[in-house]
Amino acid sequence: MKRKKKEQQVASAVCQLRDGRSHPFGALRGYVPLGTGQERIYRELREAIPVLDAAVGKMVRLADGFQVECQNKLAQEKLDQFLSMVPCVRGQYGINNFLSGYLDSLLTYGRAVGEMVVGGGKLRAVCWGDVTALEIEEGENPLETIIWGPDEQGFMKPLPYQQLLLFTTMNPEPGSPYGVSIFRGMPFLAEILMKIYQTIGTNWERAGNVRYSVICKGGNDLDPVTAQERGKAVAAEWSRAMEEGKNGTVRDFVAVGDVEIKVIGGENPILDSEVPVRQILEQLVAKTGLPPFLLGLNWSTTERMSTQQADILTSELWAIRRTVQPVVEKICRTFLALEGMDNRVSIIWDDISLQDISQEAQADLYRAQAEKYRAEAK
């Protein structure tokens, strides 16, 4: 009786080097709606999507600019000099630089904190702080807010000299002393946008670094061990040919038998990303309140700012100004009070000009002509 020859089992070579890379902004992947600790997510939103970072910068610059009027000339001169040269953090000077950093924090996190530094009975500096390192506690009455910060041992406790601290919230919700960021509602869409961009980058990387599939077709009578040895020889020659190509040397690939070479994924079309990216960006930009073309997004060849858009944007900027005006008034009044002067001041904000100057002049002319005709008719 003949024994059946035992077939030689050859281990197949499996090579799967596809990594699980995703976009580097990990906080967006772990976003939980209406959760806490969203400050890191908001920072990553600005870093990941340049349009949002540009939107915050433009809103800060558009809302900035004011003058302060005092009751007497001497107080006016001293206050103007102080506001133009007051030290801020990180080597910056002037109340405008302080207000820019304060507004940046207010728009990003929904709240901002600052401090008036008093030394020798005088107001020496005005600084803004990291609001993410602080906690807010409601006092005994709804009008009292206590700011907590870490001490030398890292424990949270109420900060001393609460009267010298500046705190502002934007659109606070009932029952919460924290404000609302303009980025709330964006992380979900931003995560989808990051996946699209990461996929686009991966596809282009593979297009520039093509992966090949080399198939050696053998007959039915080919021994498995021989087939494996032949496959290793073909793989070695193919790798050697590819390495020589990197060095600028042309090397031919010669193989015996039926060898089929294909580009992995070469027959699969790349998905069109223009429509989904535009749909997501439309919602993100709409949340900022800025016209798209101000952020470099030209979705229409004849796009321009209409009168209605200018009015809406102006109202948004004035709302931001009204939010931070009490902080500016407190700084000015504290400085004048410590100087022993009348601390009554008025904040005069600069006009927000978003329309063409020629169009505004034409509109003023039409109004003047209309008033003239009405006066003559009477």
Q: What would you call each of these model-derived segments?
A:
Residues N141-T169, R230-T314, W318, R322-Q359, ...:
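Long amphipathic alpha-helical segments
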Residues M1-G57, R61-G65, E69-G257, I264-G266, ...:
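Structured, contiguous alpha/beta core segments that scaffold functional sites
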